């Protein structure tokens, strides 16, 4: 599903990031983290999986805000405030991205997100928002079903 999404959206990358716990702070509270678990990249585009493993979620607050907005509207990286997430995207040559939450089987909890990234202004300029939004939502349903089947 990721490769089909990436190709149909003419993106550089399509990814699944999943939220999890890992470790504890000094006061005993669990550290919320995320890891990139699945990635499809256009030929010649570098994978980012290694740099997105076991990442502390609070370092990516702007990403989390975008995910919880629940609408996969493409966003220009340059429109983000100066933050760790923006620097991370820029370091990976991302000029535009789209995020949509992935929910658990009951639909109550956000367990991760589906991401598309464009690394070329020419590709980003050609994106039609009205095409990307339903495409992301459709693929999210397949991915949610697949992840739910893995936990049962």
Predicted features, each with a name:
Residues 1-45, 136-152:
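Intrinsically disordered, low-complexity terminal regulatory regions
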Residues 76, 99, 117:
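Conserved beta-strand segments of the P-loop GTPase G domain that flank and frequently precede/overlap
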Residues 110-152:
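Juxtadomain coupling helices with adjacent low-complexity linkers
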């Amino acid at each position: 599903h990721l490769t089909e999404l990436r190709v149909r959206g003419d993106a550089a990358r399509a990814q699944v990031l999943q939220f999890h716990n890992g470790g504890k702070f000094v006061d005993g509270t669990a550290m919320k983290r995320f890891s990139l678990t699945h990635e499809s990249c256009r030929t010649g585009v570098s994978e980012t999986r290694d740099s997105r493993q076991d990442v502390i979620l609070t370092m990516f607050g702007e990403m989390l805000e975008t995910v919880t907005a629940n609408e996969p509207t493409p966003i220009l990286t340059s429109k983000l405030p100066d933050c760790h997430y923006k620097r991370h995207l820029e370091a990976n040559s991302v000029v535009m991205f789209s995020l949509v939450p992935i929910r658990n089987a009951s639909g109550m909890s956000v367990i991760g997100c589906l991401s598309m990234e464009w690394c070329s202004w020419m590709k980003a300029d050609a994106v039609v928002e009205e095409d990307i939004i339903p495409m992301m939502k459709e693929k999210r349903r397949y991915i949610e079903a697949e992840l739910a089947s893995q936990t049962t």
